[in-house]
């Protein structure tokens, strides 16, 4: 795949439709691609210290080629940046640059920067133009697509935010070459998720080709494009998560609870790792409820283990709160409706479904059985 021929995936949302461009060298073309869609705009780039060191100069040069001289707002890296304090800092930076409603706010970074920047763009001047330039695999296949933005609260993950669709997503596959292997693995969990939801052929392809995806080349771009198509299809059907879009939360109810339980400490657990454990638990829980075969849960666990991802609570360093405390985090999750527990469960690989009114007693028993302190865990 050359810089001249990126793959284009359209997110079909009527007059708010936008393109995801996937290919090599897109940072150098950012100004051209943005100016074509948003002529005459000024810009602020929000990034973090690590991404800035690796990619900011390339993006700035690409923007300047398109006539855009950006203001740069740099944040510390890590999940704890998704906070009210850092939201205020980004908002103030945008206002200090005297950007107007028709100007553009660009997120250069992973999921944290994308979520924080999108929320900022959504509330400054009651909504500004927003462009995603995701630099992690997780952001390229998941968080940069679909318009969810937000920050964390001490009471839970992503509880404060808005929907704001970007005008454009530029997924430059070159930037993934600088990604630490742990971060790449974390993003891979979200990629595999699409196969587990409703594309069993994708999961089977990943089982056979995951090493090529990790190595780079055409298989990596192919996998990213397939994941983006899967998410774009769901978002076009259900933009505001009133129905099918909830399927994209496979693994996230357990995963978010584990992230909250570790106080969003990235040294212990990053988001994609939480999703990996959550997906394994969702399949195991489905098996426990006699909804799916234990063989499917074992297949998911085997694949996660093969790529080097955690797949059980015992893989998280340090002590976890007890099962009752984990259940309390789950009940705080957004996927709770009027106190009833809602989970994304499965009838098999690629057969995820929304399960409402899941008994809390069943969840608690399952958490006790799978807690690292239980002899049954593992």
UniProtKB/Swiss-Prot annotation:
Disulfide bonds: none annotated. Pathway: Metabolic intermediate biosynthesis; chorismate biosynthesis; chorismate from D-erythrose 4-phosphate and phosphoenolpyruvate: step 2/7. GO terms for molecular function: 3-dehydroquinate synthase activity; metal ion binding; nucleotide binding. CDD domains: DHQS. Zn(2+) binds at residues 190, 252, 271. It is an enzyme of class 4 (lyase). Binds 1 divalent metal cation per subunit. Can use either Co(2+) or Zn(2+). NAD(+) binds at residues 111-115, 135-136, 148, 157. It catalyses: 7-phospho-2-dehydro-3-deoxy-D-arabino-heptonate = 3-dehydroquinate + phosphate. SUPFAM superfamilies: Dehydroquinate synthase-like. Signal peptide: none annotated. It holds the Pfam family DHQS_C. GO terms for biological process: amino acid biosynthetic process; aromatic amino acid family biosynthetic process; chorismate biosynthetic process. NCBIfam families: aroB. PANTHER family: 3-DEHYDROQUINATE SYNTHASE, 3-DEHYDROQUINATE SYNTHASE, CHLOROPLASTIC. This is 3-dehydroquinate synthase. It comes from Mesorhizobium japonicum (strain LMG 29417 / CECT 9101 / MAFF 303099). The gene is aroB.
């Amino acid at each position: 795949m050359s810089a001249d021929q990126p793959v284009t995936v359209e997110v079909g949302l009527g007059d708010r439709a936008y393109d995801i461009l996937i290919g090599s060298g897109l940072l150098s073309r950012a100004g051209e691609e943005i100016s074509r869609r948003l002529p005459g705009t000024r810009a602020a780039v929000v990034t973090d210290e690590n991404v800035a060191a690796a990619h900011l100069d390339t993006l700035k040069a690409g923007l300047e080629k398109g006539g855009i001289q950006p203001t740069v707002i740099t944040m510390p890296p890590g999940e704890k940046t998704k906070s009210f304090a850092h939201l205020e800092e980004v908002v103030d930076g945008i206002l200090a640059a005297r950007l107007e409603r028709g100007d553009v706010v660009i997120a250069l970074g992973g999921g944290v920067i994308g979520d924080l920047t999108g929320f900022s763009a959504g509330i400054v001047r009651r909504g500004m133009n927003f462009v995603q330039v995701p630099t992690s695999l997780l952001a390229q296949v998941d968080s940069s697509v679909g318009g969810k933005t937000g920050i964390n609260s001490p009471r839970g993950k992503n509880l404060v935010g808005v929907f704001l669709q970007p005008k454009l997503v530029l997924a430059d596959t070159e930037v993934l070459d600088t990604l630490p292997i742990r971060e790449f693995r974390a993003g891979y969990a979200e990629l595999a998720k699409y196969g587990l939801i409703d594309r069993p052929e994708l999961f089977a392809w990943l089982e056979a080709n995951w090493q090529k995806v990790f190595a780079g080349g055409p298989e990596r771009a192919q996998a990213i494009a397939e994941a983006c198509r899967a998410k774009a299809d769901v978002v076009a059907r259900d933009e505001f998560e009133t129905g099918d879009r909830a399927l994209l939360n496979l693994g996230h109810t357990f995963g978010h609870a584990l992230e909250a339980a570790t106080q969003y400490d990235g040294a212990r657990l990053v988001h994609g790792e939480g999703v990996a454990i959550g997906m394994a638990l969702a399949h195991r829980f489905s098996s426990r409820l006699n909804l799916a075969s234990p063989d499917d849960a074992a297949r998911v666990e085997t694949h996660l283990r093969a790529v080097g991802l955690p797949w059980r609570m015992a893989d998280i360093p340090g002590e976890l709160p007890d099962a009752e405390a984990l259940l309390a985090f789950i009940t705080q999750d957004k996927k709770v409706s009027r106190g009833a527990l809602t989970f994304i469960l499965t009838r098999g690989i690629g057969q995820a479904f929304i399960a409402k009114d899941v008994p809390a007693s069943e969840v608690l028993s399952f958490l006790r059985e799978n807690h690292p302190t239980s002899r049954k865990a593992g």
